[in-house]
Every structure is written in C-alpha cells, then in structure tokens.
From Swiss-Prot:
Organism per entry: Pleurotus ostreatus (strain PC15)
Any Pfam family: Hydrophobin
Superkingdom of this protein's organism: Eukaryota
Known role: Aerial growth, conidiation, and dispersal of filamentous fungi in the environment rely upon a capability of their secreting small amphipathic proteins called hydrophobins (HPBs) with low sequence identity. Class I can self-assemble into an outermost layer of rodlet bundles on aerial cell surfaces, conferring cellular hydrophobicity that supports fungal growth, development and dispersal; whereas Class II form highly ordered films at water-air interfaces through intermolecular interactions but contribute nothing to the rodlet structure.
Localization per Swiss-Prot or TrEMBL: Secreted; Secreted, Cell wall
Protein known as: Class I hydrophobin 6
Gene name, Swiss-Prot/TrEMBL: Hydph6
One term under GO cellular component: extracellular region
Amino acid sequence: MLFKQLILVATALTTLAVATPAVMRRTEPASSCSTGPVNCCNSSGTAKDGNIAKELALLGIVVPDINALIGVSCSPITVIGAGGASCSSQTLCCEDNKYNGIVALGCIPVDISL
C-alpha cells in the first residue's frame, strides 16, 4: 500500500515538473538599449544571490525587486559592430548605472552579435 502511494506521488511530481514552463530571460537586440551604452559585465544575478546581496549591502543599495537582474563589474561598450567592440562576459542593458561600474541595476541581457 505504501509503495502504491509512493509511486502515485512520484508520478504526480514528475507530471508537474514536465508541465511547469522553464523561466527564460528575454534577450533584446543591442539597438533597443535606450538607457545608455550596452554594458559588458563580469557577472550578473539577482539581489537574492549571496555575493551580489553582500555587495549591495556594502554600498547601501536597496533593490525594490529582488528578482531583477543586476550586473556586477560593468563597463560600457561604446561602439557596437565597429570591429573592436566585444565582450567575453555578459552584455546587458541596464536602467541604473550610477554606481561607477561596481553594480548596474534593472538589467536586460542584450545580443551584440550582428
């Protein structure tokens, strides 16, 4: 009897896992970045991520949406498609870049490939 219940629960969980859509971050073309230059960031994550949370706390930054994408150690890519503009890390378009590249808030991944 216990074995049947275990099989039933396992089947239900498997069905739920298959039916649940995966969370996907959208990627925008670089031309849609209206907040300034596209940034090349060493890493990105959310305010829930341990290292990012520590960095935000040290800077005294309170993020209203803990699920919003945050760029870390960012520098602007000023000329996209001009041959020299490249980023081996993550390219992001961010709304709030006033922290001297340490962090950038409200980011969306962008595609700089042509």
